[in-house]
Design a protein with these regions (language model features):
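Anion-binding and metal-coordination hotspots
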Residues: 1-291
Length: 291
């Protein structure tokens, strides 16, 4: 495995899914370390929807899964994706791609000097190429901050499905999107932290992917048993202490209820101040966190 900020060596990756309500592990999928995180993502969502008859409203993951292809496939499943933000790579001292504004009506980019980068072609990898005129770039006062010594004109690439990525990015910046992403660190991040610190998943105890898969599955089973016991214990305690809260959720106390795709928002009074969970027509439906 060769990744920035990660140790180099032979590793396995545990692609885990938890529900956003109780932090129950719903899927464990182990791959070699040279497999990109985004490769099995949508496949694991579909597998769980078919196997457990899940009807999630949204999925959330870190920036490693924030690709145009995944956003398109998640959208086609009728889901909303809330992913971490990944900045486009740029050279030190040079303008990043965020400095160039895309105008969808004209299908052009506008540079900081208000010059157009027009569409030229689409390459075999599915990226549209936008180029500025060489004559304009050669006379630009900010040429040193924009081009390298080998470039004669500015060129940008945009994936053909980039619009889906922009759509999910807009939702992630909304109040609903922020609440979902905030919940992510309390679920999937906590689940992995417990696995490493309390259950020995920081290291492989056996060789081979089959043995590692067995270790990951057993670890997930133990964590789920502990979580289920804790949830049932809280439910029994809650029933004893309050007879007036039977209609409320036994897993999370919420400050508000919200749903996606144009559903109306409704507010609930609650002094506890826990984050929101997805609601549809008054019934809780899950959203998934994959890592």
């Amino acid at each position: 495995m060769h990744r920035d900020g990660k140790p180099q060596g032979f590793f396995y990756l545990d692609h885990r899914t938890v529900d956003g309500k109780c932090n129950i592990i719903t899927d464990v999928y182990v791959t070699p370390g040279n497999i990109n995180d985004a490769t099995p993502y949508v496949e694991r969502i579909i597998t769980q929807m078919e196997k457990f008859n899940f009807e999630p409203e949204a999925v959330s993951a870190d920036a490693g899964y924030n690709t145009s292809v995944i956003c398109k496939e998640v959208y086609d499943l009728g889901l909303v994706g809330v992913f971490g933000y990944r900045r486009a790579p740029s050279q030190k001292g040079k303008f990043s791609k965020s400095k160039f504004r895309y105008i969808p009506e004209w299908d052009v980019y506008i540079c900081p000097q208000r010059c157009y980068l027009e569409y030229k072609t689409t390459n075999r990898d599915g990226y549209k190429e936008y180029k500025a005129q060489k004559q304009i770039c050669s006379q630009c006062p900010q040429r040193e901050s924009c081009l390298t010594s080998k470039q004669e004109g500015k060129m940008l690439q945009r994936h053909i499905w980039e619009d889906y990525k922009d759509l999910f990015r807009t939702f992630a910046l909304s109040d609903e999107g922020k609440a979902i992403y905030k919940r992510r660190k309390e679920t999937i991040e906590r689940s992995f932290a417990d696995s490493k610190e309390l259950h020995g998943l920081r290291y492989c105890h056996m060789r081979g992917i089959d043995s590692v898969r067995e270790q990951c599955l057993l670890t997930a089973a133990v964590q789920n048993m502990k979580k289920i016991a804790l949830v049932k214990s809280r439910r029994n305690t809650k029933r004893k202490t309050s007879r007036n809260d039977r209609g409320r959720s036994i897993f999370l106390r919420t400050t508000s209820e919200f749903s996606l795709f144009g559903q109306m928002k409704t507010q609930k009074e609650n002094p506890s101040g826990f984050v929101s969970v997805l609601m549809v027509s008054g019934l809780q439906r899950p959203f998934l966190f994959l890592e």
